[in-house]
Structure formats: C-alpha cells, structure tokens
Swiss-Prot record:
Protein species of origin: Prosthecochloris aestuarii (strain DSM 271 / SK 413)
PANTHER family: ANTITERMINATION NUSB DOMAIN-CONTAINING PROTEIN (PTHR11078:SF3), N UTILIZATION SUBSTANCE PROTEIN B-RELATED (PTHR11078)
Alphabetical UniProt keywords: RNA-binding, Transcription, Transcription antitermination, Transcription regulation
Membrane-spanning parts: none
GO biological process terms on file: DNA-templated transcription termination; transcription antitermination
Superkingdom, natural source: Bacteria
InterPro entries in UniProt: NusB-like_sf, NusB_fam, NusB_RsmB_TIM44
SUPFAM superfamilies reported in the protein's UniProt record: NusB-like
GO molecular function: RNA binding
Protein name as catalogued: Transcription antitermination protein NusB
Keyword Cell cycle: no
Keyword Transcription set for record: yes
GO cellular component annotations of the record: cytosol
C-alpha cells in the first residue's frame, strides 16, 4: 500500500512534537513514528526523512519567518502542535520546489483541524501561512519549478504589466 503524503506530514508533526517535549535526537523521534506503510514505500521514506531534516536543519530560519508574521504572539506562546504544523508547511514552501505552496498551506490547515490544539488552530495556521506566503511571493523568494507549481495569477499580473514594446 502506498503511503499518502498527508499521513507522512502528520507523522512529521508528531516527530517534531516529540523533539520539543522529550530529550531525544531527530533519528530516534523519526524512527518511532515511521509506520510500516511509510517504511515499505521508498518514496515515502525519502520524503519523510527529507522533510524532517529540512525542518530540523533550518528551524531558526523557519522560525524567523513565522515570528515576523505572528505580530502579537511570542513563539513560546504558540501551541506546540500549531508551531510544528507551521514549521512543516514553511519547510515545504521554502525548500521543496516540487510542492505548490497552496498544497502545503491546505495540508497544514487540514492537519491543524485534525490535531486541533485549540478551536481556532486551523484559522491561526491559515492566517500565518497566508501572510508569510504573500510576503515571500512579493519579494520573489518562492522558488518553484514544474507545471502547475507557480501561482498562475502572479504570472498573469506580471505579463499584463509588461508592455508589447518590451518584447522588441
């Protein structure tokens, strides 16, 4: 049976939670949560390890992006689950060129609904990720390649701003 990415993302959030509340290393936290479904699928295990590694290796940078958009919230006050859902989505947006940002944001919202640390978790996660995405998009820091990965509305807007004389 093929492991679904949502299942993998949920396990990533759980591994990050484990790292926050227990004295353990990344490999151990990840190994505890790799299900047989994930371990039998080479693509799934690779995605799991790459995503978890990207979050752990770039946590400081990811947290800076999140902090910049949590105006009245100190990072220490954000629920651990919500913080780790945000970190997971941010890692995908920043470091995974093959995953559309809208997919990362939607997956984070759905996972926030499932884990539901508060009754407003999904709205909080949506608001922060939307603000970060818009900021990154405006500053040209979204680096996505492949068909369907770039927000088409951004491309249309850029093309409309370009005058016909620019092509000559």
């Amino acid at each position: 049976m093929k492991a679904h990415r949502r299942h993998i993302r949920e396990k990533i959030v759980q591994a990050l939670y484990t790292l926050d509340v227990r004295d353990t290393d990344t490999a151990t936290a990840g190994d505890w949560l790799i299900t047989p479904e994930i371990s039998k699928d080479p693509k799934a295990i690779r995605f799991f390890k790459q995503l978890l590694g990207a979050i752990v290796d770039n946590r400081e940078e990811i947290d800076q992006y999140i902090s910049k958009h949590t105006f009245n919230w100190d990072m220490s006050r954000i629920a651990i689950i919500d913080k780790n859902i945000l970190r997971m989505a941010m890692a995908e947006i920043l470091y995974f060129e093959d995953i559309p940002p809208k997919v990362s944001i939607n997956e984070a919202i759905e996972i926030a609904k499932k884990f539901n640390s508060t009754d407003k978790s999904s709205k909080f996660v949506n608001g922060i990720l939307d603000a970060v995405y818009n900021d990154l998009n405006k500053s040209g820091k979204i680096n996505k390649c492949g068909r369907g990965l770039i927000d088409q509305s951004s491309n249309l807007k850029k093309n409309k701003e370009k005058s016909p004389s620019d092509d000559q």
